[in-house]
Amino acid sequence: MLQNERTYIAIDLKSYYASVECMERGLDPMQTNLVVADPSRTEKTICLAVSPALKAYGIPGRARLFEVVERVRQVNAERQRRAPGGRLTGKSADDLALKADASLAVDYLVAPPRMAKYIEVSMQIYGIYLKYISPEDIHTYSIDEVLMDVTGYLETYRTTARELAKTMILDVLHTTGITATAGIGSNLYLCKVAMDMMAKRVPPDENGVRIAHLDERSYRALLWEHRPLTDFWRVGRGYAKKLEEHGLYTMGDVARCSIGKPNEYYNEGLLYKLFGVNAELLIDHAWGWEPCRMADINAYRPETNSSSSGQVLQCPYPYDKARLVVREMAEAVALELLEKRIVTDQLTLTVGYDIENTASGSYRGETVLDPYGRKIPKHAHGTATLGQKTSSVRRIVDAVLGIYDEKADPKLTVRRLTVTANRLVREEDILCEPEQPVQFSLFDDPAARERQLRQEEVKQERERRIQEALLDIKKKYGKNAILSGGSYLDGATARERNRQIGGHKA
């Protein structure tokens, strides 16, 4: 290995949530038809995971539950047509049984999500990785995916990257019953692409393990002509659409465009015109380059200074009912800021309306298309500036409700809500800032103003002590140990959301 050459491994746990649910039931994750979804949210709910056996019927990993129901119905209609005597005599969720008996209908298990369990198993698996790799050389990309810099370990263990990846994956398999896919690359981008795109093409071994490898040369040879562009990491539909509108359909096209002459239509100037500074990363990835290393990830501190809380309501909410949820969300944002010792002076609220508002045909206002191409009323959006940085529940709630009262349409039902605290600053940084001078007019009473400021400070200090007491109680006894009275009214969501992790059942 050259002195500056590095080796990275990406590992992705196979259908993670579904695999955990199968193992909890003593079932084989590779042979059991199972979806992780909350049926109590109706069949429109999104499936968090689909087992590999069920995916084999053409069901995508993030399908909605009704799509699973419909696809299985279609599969069973075809199985019945081919079954002996045209009859299905039973059903099974076991793939081996279904392949052995053509008279069985395809069945599947629906497992409600248990996020706390998935986090617990993920931490257990991370502990397995730590047996081989130091934490500073591991980046946790998601609950079921990690990236590792294994450059310094190959010589230590006297092994290859493939053997090291396989050793770790088999350790995870034997400990938890969950298998995985791995990608190996000469940089972080290539190991991720090898895992996401190439490992799918590799036949699994006897343990269901797939491992693929890419370097810059093989990346260009194997993937420069690959379509669609959205299969590549960090290329979304918007990027792909812009590129295709300009005749760029593959990563090879993007790479060739980047070296065009200034007087030619296709040159890097076109890419920078389309994507701004983001074109630099797109060009690097088109060539299979990635300058970022693990040390850069560990040293990174995000520049964005906002915190948001959003939720999709279980059903369309009328104006007053949605206002109650907005209050709960604003309270939660304020308490989170206090817990983290962060303050804000700007808040935004976005109110998304339900499709039922346009279904009747009576709505005459401005519309936009939702992700399914349906017309819905354009969302309401507003911003409030506080004039002083704070984490006061009272001030934050008043500001957010003020936006809602001003911007939301009382005649429309609400489906989505997002509250965002902007321009966040740590409390300790505020204390270090010099006090801003106050300019008085001839008609101001400085003494009265001073008394008013002191009264407000006392009020804020009393409120802060109450808020900190609330936080202490919630930390000790749970988030639902103490709530405002509004959270017990019909339509309130805080109690249920406090039982969730990431919007799903804990």
Tell where the protein language model's regions lie, with residue ranges.
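Gly/Gly-Pro- and Ser/Thr-rich, intrinsically disordered tail segments characteristic of DNA damage-repair
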Residues: 1-287, 291-294, 442, 447-506
